[in-house]
From Swiss-Prot:
Pfam family, one: Ribosomal_L18p
Name of the protein in its database record: Large ribosomal subunit protein uL18
GO cellular component, as recorded: cytoplasm; ribonucleoprotein complex; ribosome
InterPro entries: Ribosomal_uL18_bac-type, Ribosomal_uL18_bac/euk
NCBIfam families to which the protein is assigned, alphabetical: L18_bact
Function comment: This is one of the proteins that bind and probably mediate the attachment of the 5S RNA into the large ribosomal subunit, where it forms part of the central protuberance.
Assembly, per entry: Part of the 50S ribosomal subunit; part of the 5S rRNA/L5/L18/L25 subcomplex. Contacts the 5S and 23S rRNAs.
Amino acid sequence: MSIKSKNKLRQHRKIRIRKKIFGTADQPRLVIFRSNLHIYAQLVDDITGSTLLTTSTLSLKDNGINIRANKSGSTLVGKEIARLAIEKQIIKIVFDRNGYLYHGRVKAVADGAREGGLKF
């Protein structure tokens, strides 16, 4: 399967998922973006269209943590987004895998967020 068709299928899955899930200020949407070098996680309030919190392997590297975008690094990103959310009294979230399969790095972010104290 070519890269173009793989990305096109992911975009169709993304649209299908976004029709069903919705984040609010009390229960924001945790969105995952995966690139070859980094993984990003952000909490989004869909009512106002604003990003409440964000973290990534890139921001953790800036803080002095030696991290890569593998499963262990993704778990750390999940724990960090959970820590930041709990500081803002956000406990419940809606998980948006952004069209990616719930496997590998995406699952590791979700598991890290659960370990950090977030409820899906």
